[in-house]
A protein has these predicted regions:
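A common structural junction motif
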Residues: 47-56, 89-96, 128-131, 185-191
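Ordered, small/hydrophobic-rich secondary-structure cores
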Residues: 3-63, 67
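Core segments of cupin and vicinal oxygen chelate
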Residues: 114-149, 179
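Short, structured interface segments
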Residues: 81-101
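N-terminal beta-strand motif that seeds the catalytic metal site of vicinal oxygen chelate
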Residues: 94, 98-119, 217-219
Length: 219
């Protein structure tokens, strides 16, 4: 097995990584550090291990815990590199007396029903500032991991229903104009700019709405 070969869910499960869970394309866990200083210490140790392995996880430091996400960006999946580094990180945490709670991890994705994802995917990539998923042509994602992925669920063509929820995208004020322009250029339409600059309502070619919002005009 090469270190660029993606592992199946069963192979990852067989590796016995008790501190970790595989969710989608990544290994994830939460280390219960209890305070900021211990969290900083653990993050420093994770950083040293990552540099030594030349393999770098995503690390989210909070006051009572540290979230860690591991996957091989070059193949967009879990490889032996991730398994090895996960074991090393667990050892470092144990040396600090820090336990893991992998059951606290979760990943939220947003699914949009559509009869033709190719018609609306460019709009959603533009309005959300995302890119095409390397895993599927039916999804867009945020490479930074800051926002949940959006994927397009196949459905039969139907009349436009009354929309019960929509996505609001809050951006810095200086970004809003270009974000709106990109969304319109990608096949979107302007529904309303009555409340600009607080928010502008856009829609994709099938009538699904999104708002580009800023902090301006909310005093």
């Amino acid at each position: 097995m090469t270190d660029t070969q993606t592992l199946t869910f069963a192979e990852v499960d067989a590796a016995g990584l008790d501190d970790w869970r595989q969710l989608f394309e990544a290994l994830r866990t939460r280390f219960l550090t209890g305070d900021f200083a211990t969290g900083l210490d653990l993050v420093a140790r994770i950083g040293a291990l990552a540099e030594e392995a030349n393999h770098h996880p995503d690390v989210d430091l909070r006051y009572p815990h540290v979230n860690v996400t591991l996957f091989s960006h070059d193949v967009f999946g879990v490889t032996a590199r991730d398994v090895d580094l996960a074991r090393a990180i667990s050892t470092a945490a144990a040396e600090l007396g820090v336990s893991a709670d992998p059951t606290a991890t979760a990943v939220v994705e947003v699914a949009l029903d559509t009869w033709d994802h190719t018609e609306i995917k460019p709009f959603w990539a533009a309005v959300l500032g995302m890119v095409d998923s390397p895993e599927s042509d039916r999804a867009v994602f945020d490479p930074s991991g800051a926002m949940p992925a959006l994927w397009f669920q196949r459905t039969e063509r139907h009349d436009e229903p009354r929309q019960r929820f929509h996505l609001d995208v809050r951006v810095p004020p200086e970004v809003a104009e270009s974000r709106i322009a990109d969304a319109l250029a990608a096949g979107g339409t302007l529904v309303s700019d009555e409340h600009a600059p607080r928010f502008v309502v856009l829609a994709d070619a099938q009538g699904n709405k999104a708002c580009v919002t800023t902090g301006l005009g909310r005093e």
